Structure formats: structure tokens, C-alpha cells
Amino acid sequence: MEHKMNYKKILRGGLIVAFWLVIWTLAARIIDNKLLFVSPLETLKKLVVSVCDGNFWKTVLGSTARIGAGFLFGLIIGLALAVASAKLKLIEELLSPVMKLCAAVPVASFVVILLIWWGSRFLAVSICFLVVLPIVYTNTLEGIKSFDKELLEMATVFRMPLKNRLFYIYLPSLRPFLYSALKVSLGLSWKSGVAAEVIGIPDYSIGEKLYLSKVYLDTAGVFAWTVVVILLSVIFEKIILCLAQRALQWQPICKKPASTKQPKTEGIQLANVNKSYGDNNVLTDLTRTIASGETVILREPSGSGKTTLLRLLAGLEKPDQGTITCGRVGYLFQEDRLIAHISAVKNVALVTGDEAKAREALKQVLDAEDIDKPCEQLSGGMKRRAALVRAVESDCDVLLLDEPFNGLDDESREKVEKYMKERQNGRSMVIASHI
């Protein structure tokens, strides 16, 4: 069936191309002036003659090298500046007028200015760079700003290695923005690059061939070299997008969390902890010691500060007053905070660094056929259990579990309670639960 669909798609595309070739042929016959317009056949003949010319491939390689270099420089520098702007607001503010200027100023103006400054040697490279830079920068920065803050918090709490964050959180979020930037900038780089060559006329360039065709009133030559530009642009785009797709979809083996120099802490100690949001006092003079191996269940109404306390213990928020002593934590957030496009096994292995261990742990609370499904295909209760296993299997001194039984039926809850008791392993455990 799939083969048949592909055949139909190819046939449909071929018919569309044939339709426009017929229109092109009819237009050439109606105009009937080879100085103004030539037919597809005349264009093909000229193209064959050009290909047979010994300088054809030098010309193609010369233009491809210039345009490719400009595109590559724009891509790399655009990505780097977007990351820097996301890190520091001042850089974003400083670069904002520059990027707007690059996007707004006509290419022809840049061409004239750069011709005056540098001549024609690096003109095409510079123009491609100036066209690609703002597109890549803007799209990448927008993608970085769209990162899921909850997933970033999760990665911080579990001390997820940078490599895991890069390939499982950052790049998947950036993927649609980068694809969009690449598709737009690839086409524009060829248009602007060849236009710059037409004006600068560097040796062994398609722009030079187009210019000479114009000078000698060789309309067939103009059409033939235009076809070459279109073909090169399509091939260039296919190659770059294919490489980008492979790079952005690659998922390396999960690394173990980075080792911490933080000394092992016995239990939890809170001394005169105060926390408020505006005029709302959430925690007031809270003093408590929770020993290693001890389990504390917080049964308070909603809004009483249970989640706030857990976030304080996890280091995600700071108390207004008082001190908190707490070791490394494994945190089951109020939300599941699973990476939706990968499996439950991968989600746990990203934290433990051991896929076999993650698989065995998940089998205690999930059916075997569910642990390899993408988390976006799991039910709410299944996601909750997967998130719980991630917290419990993490290398930590303290377990913080916010509503661990939310969305679970009686049978699933019984499995989870048994698993939690078996895997506590002398760690302090704080459970937040509604009354």
C-alpha cells in the first residue's frame, strides 16, 4: 500500500511538472522571440552545451563553495549568538537592532557597501552570511525561549548530564525552529549569493555566467544557468536538511548523572524556615528534623505549603529566613514531567544511566508492553508510576514525593506502595498528600 502511495505521489508530481513545461513551451511559441523568451528545448540544448564546457564544474564548485561558506558561517554564528542572548539579556538587547538591520536592509544596499569596502572576492560569502544570520538567530532564540521550564527544573534536580539534556530536551524543542530557519535560509542564500555574484562578477561563478549571457543577449544561457541554480539549491537543501534531521534525531546512550562533591547528608534538618509569596505567609518558623530512613507524610489541605516545602528541600526555591540542610534528592513532582516523545525506560535511564536497571524497576509497577511506548501514549496513571520510578531509582539521599498516588486505582496503588517500601533503602522520604 505504501509503495502504491509513493508511486501515485511521483506520478502526480511528474504530471504537474509536465503541465508547466507545456505552459512554458506555449508561452515561447506565442512570444516567438528568442531574445526575450526561449522554450524548454532551447534551454536544455544550452544546458548540455554548458555542461560539456570544461569550466562548467569549476563554475559550479566555485559558486557552491562561496554560498556554502556564507551559509555555514551564518548558521554557526547565528546559533552561538542566540545561545549567548538566551543566557544574558544584555546581549539580546545589544544584538536586537543589528539583527533587525540585517533583515530590513535590501541586499542590493549591502552589495554596494561591501563592494566599496572589500571588492568582489568575498562578496557572495558576506551577502549569504548577512542573509542567513538573522534568520538562524531569531528562530533559534525563539526556540530556546520556548524550552519547557518544568523539564529544565527536572533535569537540574536529577543532575542530568549536559549531553542528556542536549539530545533529549534542548534539541527536540529546537527542532521545528531550526528546520524552519534552515528551509528559509537555504533558499535565500542561493538567491542572494548568485545576485551578489552577478554584481561582483568573481571568476568561476554562476553570477559571472549570467552576467555574460546578459551582455551577449544569450537568453537561452540565462535560462540554462537559472536552471542550474535551481537544481543546486534543491540538492543543497536536501543534503543539509537530511544531515540536520539525522543530527537532531540522534539519541546517544544515556550517561550517568554527574558526581557531586556534596558530602552525604544524614536526613533533613529545617531551622526556623520562613517562606512567603507577597502577603501570603506559606511557612512560618518551621523547625523539623527528619532522620535517615524516616517517612513523613504531609496530610494538609491544598494551599497549605506542601509543594512549597518540597521545592525548598529540592533547592528549587530559597527560604526567606532560616536554614535547610538536605542531601541529594529524588523528586516526584506534582506534575509527571516526563519527556513525552521517548519511552518510560528512557526517561528513567536518563536519570540512572542504566537502562537495564530502569527496565527492571519499571516492570514492578507497569506492564512489560508499556515500558517501551513513548510516554505520550501512556495513560495518566502509567505516567505517574513511571515518574515515581524515576525519582526512587535516582542516586539520592532523600525522596520527595508529591501526590505519588494521584490517578492510581487500588491495584496500582498497592503495587506502588510495595515498591516504595522495598526501594526506600534507608533514605528519608517525605510524601505530600491531600486530606
Residue ranges and their predicted role:
Residues 314:
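Helix-to-loop junction immediately C-terminal to a conserved catalytic motif
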Residues 410-412:
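Helix N-cap at the start of a conserved alpha-helix in ABC-type nucleotide-binding domains
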Residues 399-403:
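Catalytic Walker B motif of ABC-type/P-loop ATPase nucleotide-binding domains
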Residues 341-357:
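Q-loop/switch helix immediately C-terminal to the Walker
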Residues 126, 130, 163-196, 229:
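Transmembrane alpha-helices
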Residues 156, 356-370:
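Conserved ABC ATPase "signature" region
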Residues 374-382:
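Conserved ABC ATPase signature
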